[in-house]
Amino acid sequence: AWMDIVASGSKYGRNILLLGNHSESAELTDKLRKKAAEKYVEKKISVPFEIPFTTLNKLSITLFNNAYYMKARSKTDFQHYDKYFYPLDFILNWNHIYSKSGLIQYQLNIPEEAGKDAVDKVLKKVVASGGGSFLAVLKKMGDQDGILSFPFKGYTLSMDFPVKKGIIEMCKELDAIVLDHGGRTYLTK
């Protein structure tokens, strides 16, 4: 699910839930079967240079999130798995929008039973701090497969924050919430 983690008040917690099913050829109409057989080439856009100052602030993130949310609507669509699993890969050099200051990618994993409370506390902390994230993605995770793998059964929330004053302190506060709920943060981001 895409989440708007800048919104507050009646818009707090709004999101777009994406669900998908694998399609068998026999399930498709002739038109969709032809589309599926075509080579998938996604149109890409690029941020060609590093922007010298951060354009990401509460106002710009709010405007983007409002537009993105309004564009989304309940619909059924047929799309290539690349577009479904990697929806932002059409933007090349996306990190340039964060200026030379850069960004912090923060990802947490919370046990399923603590998910609602922990995610709510994290979102409220981010909203209160004005930290806003241009990108926030919430996923439900299955059982942990490997002894050294990061994810375990529960929820993972990934957020990209522009580096600015107070961001390290906010991340430390998020760390405390995650630990209090039996979760973990992804240290290699």
Question: Which residues does each PLM region occupy?
Answer:
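Noncatalytic alpha-helical scaffold of FAD-dependent oxidoreductases
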Residues: 1-189
